[in-house]
């Protein structure tokens, strides 16, 4: 049965997880998909989605056009809204990963839904961050920085080397033509990024370039100062959800008094009534 809703749903925003197929898709998302009139696939695995629904439109060719990313996102958003306006509610969009992690199309649909008088419902899914912390063996609960590679330099974002860092879309550094096909990366493409990162980390600090696929994950270790030496690897996997994981430096305790207090029952009695 479809997920409960007080009113009809015009658009469901769904994710099928990181690995190929739908093994990481939640039961709630599958129910919503099966209850839909039409499914737009932006996940890159329309074949798997067609096993769950008979009416699937693959938007692969509409996505990989070589245009600027914002132009692609706008057109896809307009396509989905036009379908609902012209033919009625009951549309689902399926993407890879979590539907609301690093997905401008879905966020625009959700943020503009009230103005358009559309009921847009996003359902949780499994993102690359969920799987990557298992792949690299680091708990996000210890604190993390998650940044888009171009925004890192564009906005001059300062990084804390004592927090683990995930740099998304690293293979697309230096361009917004993210779906424009290229033959190779020229020498020096990643030199400005290496220079930026080594403002916060030593040049010999080792990072991991990773495509998170569980047991089939693809990785390459590289020193930050030598990042440009991995340009062939970065090109080969630029469209595969490639991320750079930078491990954290250990951080010493800065407030010994607070550290002592949080383990002290007498201190707890001074800030709360015990049961």
Predicted segments — roles?
Residues 1-123, 242-243, 267-275:
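Class I S-adenosyl-L-methionine
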Residues 2-14, 32, 38, 119-121, ...:
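Beta-strand/loop-alpha-helix module characteristic of Rossmann-like adenine-cofactor folds
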């Amino acid at each position: 049965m479809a997920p409960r809703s007080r009113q009809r749903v015009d658009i469901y925003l769904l994710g099928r997880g990181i690995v190929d197929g739908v093994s990481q898709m939640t039961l709630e998302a599958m129910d919503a998909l099966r209850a839909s009139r039409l499914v737009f696939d932006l996940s890159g695995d329309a074949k798997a989605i067609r096993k769950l629904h008979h009416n699937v439109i693959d938007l692969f060719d509409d996505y990989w056009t070589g245009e600027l990313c914002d132009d692609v996102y706008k057109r896809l958003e307009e396509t989905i809204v036009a379908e609902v306006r012209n033919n009625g509610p009951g549309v689902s969009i399926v993407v890879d990963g979590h539907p609301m992690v690093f997905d401008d199309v879905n966020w625009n649909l959700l943020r503009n839904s009230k103005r358009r008088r559309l009921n847009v419902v996003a359902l949780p899914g499994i993102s690359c961050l969920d799987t990557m912390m298992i792949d690299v063996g680091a708990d996000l609960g210890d604190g993390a920085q998650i940044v888009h590679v171009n925004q890192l330099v564009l906005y001059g974002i300062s990084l804390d080397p004592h927090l683990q860092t995930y740099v998304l879309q690293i293979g697309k550094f230096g361009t917004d033509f993210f779906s424009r096909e290229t033959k190779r990366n020229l020498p020096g493409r990643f030199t400005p990024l290496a220079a930026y990162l080594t403002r916060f980390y030593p040049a010999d600090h080792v990072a991991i370039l990773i495509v998170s696929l569980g047991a089939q994950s693809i990785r390459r270790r590289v020193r930050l100062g030598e990042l440009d030496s991995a340009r062939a690897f970065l090109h080969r996997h630029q469209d595969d959800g490639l991320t750079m994981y930078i491990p954290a430096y250990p951080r010493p305790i800065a407030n010994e008094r607070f550290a002592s207090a949080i383990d002290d029952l007498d201190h707890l009695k001074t800030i709360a009534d015990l049961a």
